[in-house]
UniProtKB/Swiss-Prot annotation:
InterPro entries: 4pyrrol_synth_GluRdtase, 4pyrrol_synth_GluRdtase_dimer, 4pyrrol_synth_GluRdtase_N, GluRdtase_CS, GluRdtase_dimer_dom_sf, GluRdtase_N_sf, NAD(P)-bd_dom_sf, Shikm_DH/Glu-tRNA_Rdtase. The gene is hemA. CDD domains: NAD_bind_Glutamyl_tRNA_reduct (cd05213). Catalyzes the NADPH-dependent reduction of glutamyl-tRNA(Glu) to glutamate 1-semialdehyde (GSA). During catalysis, the active site Cys acts as a nucleophile attacking the alpha-carbonyl group of tRNA-bound glutamate with the formation of a thioester intermediate between enzyme and glutamate, and the concomitant release of tRNA(Glu). The thioester intermediate is finally reduced by direct hydride transfer from NADPH, to form the product GSA. Pathway: Porphyrin-containing compound metabolism; protoporphyrin-IX biosynthesis; 5-aminolevulinate from L-glutamyl-tRNA(Glu): step 1/2. It is an enzyme of class 1 (oxidoreductase). This is Glutamyl-tRNA reductase. NADP(+) binds at residues 187-192.
Length: 428
């Protein structure tokens, strides 16, 4: 039994590398099944977000190199390139890492709540793929409990901060009066929903939601009095938009330099503020070369995020302590489980010996045997049978000079004295 947590995140890899190592939702089930099949992993789950791609694995023997090689091959990267950005956590450290991630302690925005939902989605997909078993299943449940405790018992979730909030904060810095600004939001997922909520609360003049399907865009738009359009309508909406924030699951860019350049001409070069939160990127990096465009990627949000971290450092320290306790408790319970099969077998063996001696005693009583004598014989017979196998093994270990094993037996049977005291005795 061994746990692995390995992958890359916003702290170790550039957005370019994260794009190439990201898994699409459609890939996950097949990728999980292939991962288990090709790396001798008994259980596995994959967490893939715009800021991280991580594998959580349970194996008989740790083989991080094999898993890293699989990840590199799957995404057509060189192993050296992946190693340069990857991290590996094993056993206790892997458990602690998972709990830190789910609690928002390892996020770009400290304490952001979305990561717990993403972790739950990773668990659900792994169950669908059939790659979650009893051990990873227990670890995920312990992880969810730890994250819930952190969220409930610390102030880390107060004054909610997220990548979405950071994007809107940047917009506020550039446009002094958002109530006169128009915003185009591309996508209709959780991040864009948060962006829409923040912009709506700030009284942005007009919000447009563009999505691949009009139905999904409309569902989001209705919540905030926004307008819904298709992706094909983006060029027309760009002309009217002062703020563009994009976060889709598209594998290809949604916005190119040419389209933005055309919109700027029609806007008479009135500036456009753009934030690309997606991985892979929705907006071609070359768009940032245009004079009247302020283009930010997720990696550019670090400065904004840093300001919001200050108020959360005290809460983070308390959260770290909770995570450490949760991880330690989980590993203790897990190691206790390792003894269950041995204890079960020992109990079954003891009950079989008890039943044999009991049947013998009942036969003696049925034949008129003295009850006191029969009970004494039952007690002696049961004692001898229960002690026979341990006695044989202890004598063998003693003959081999295995004082460590004798000390363990002494602890196991709660005996007084030290096995060392016998080592100085010489035969008479």
């Amino acid at each position: 039994m061994a746990f692995l947590a390995l992958g890359i995140n916003h702290k170790t890899a550039s957005v370019d590398v994260r794009e190439r190592v990201a898994f699409t939702p459609e890939q996950l089930v097949e990728a999980l099944q292939q991962l288990c099949r090709l790396t001798d992993s008994r259980e596995a789950a994959i967490l893939s977000t715009c800021n991280r791609s991580e594998l959580y694995i349970e194996q008989d023997q740790l083989s991080a190199d094999i898993v890293l090689r699989w990840l590199a091959d799957y995404h057509h990267l060189s192993l050296d390139e992946l190693r340069a950005s990857a991290y590996v956590h094993e056993d206790d450290a892997a458990v602690r890492h998972m709990m830190r991630v789910a609690s928002g302690l390892d996020s770009l925005v400290l304490g952001e709540p979305q990561i717990l939902g993403q972790m739950k989605s990773a668990y659900a997909v792994a169950r669908e793929a059939g790659t979650i078993g009893p051990l990873l299943g227990r670890l995920f449940q312990a992880t969810f409990n730890a994250a819930k405790q952190v969220r409930t018992d610390t102030a880390i979730g107060e004054n909610p901060v997220s990548v979405a909030f950071a994007a809107v904060s940047l917009a506020k810095q550039i446009f002094s009066d958002l109530q006169r600004s128009q915003a185009l939001l591309i996508g209709a997922g959780e991040t864009i929903t948060l962006v829409a909520r923040h912009l709506h609360e700030l009284g942005v003049k007009r919000i447009v939601v563009a999505n691949r399907t009009l139905e999904r865009a409309s569902l989001l738009a209705e919540q905030f009095g926004a307008h819904a359009v298709l992706l094909s309508d983006i060029p027309a909406e760009l002309v009217r938009s002062d703020i563009v924030i994009s976060s889709t699951a598209s594998q290809l860019p949604i916005l190119g330099k040419g389209a933005v350049e055309s919109a700027l001409k029609l806007r008479k070069h009135k500036p456009i503020f753009m934030v690309d939160i997606a991985v892979p990127r929705d907006i071609e990096p070359e768009v940032g070369e245009l004079d009247d465009v302020y283009l930010y990627s997720v990696d550019d949000l670090h400065e904004v995020v840093a300001e919001n971290l200050k108020s959360r450092q005290g809460a983070a320290q308390a959260a770290e302590e909770m995570v450490s306790v949760g991880a330690d408790d989980f590993m203790v319970r897990l190691r206790e489980l390792a003894a269950v099969d041995v204890l079960k077998a020992y109990r079954q063996q003891s009950e079989r010996l008890r039943d044999e001696e009991l049947q013998k005693a009942l036969r003696l009583l049925a034949n008129g045997g003295n009850a006191e004598d029969v009970l004494g014989q039952l007690a002696r017979g049961l004692t001898n049978k229960l002690l026979h196998a341990p006695s044989v093994q202890l004598k063998k270990l003693s003959a081999e000079g295995r004082l460590d094993a004798l000390a363990m037996a002494q602890e196991l049977f709660a005996l007084e004295g030290s096995p060392d005291s016998f080592s100085d005795k010489k035969p008479q």
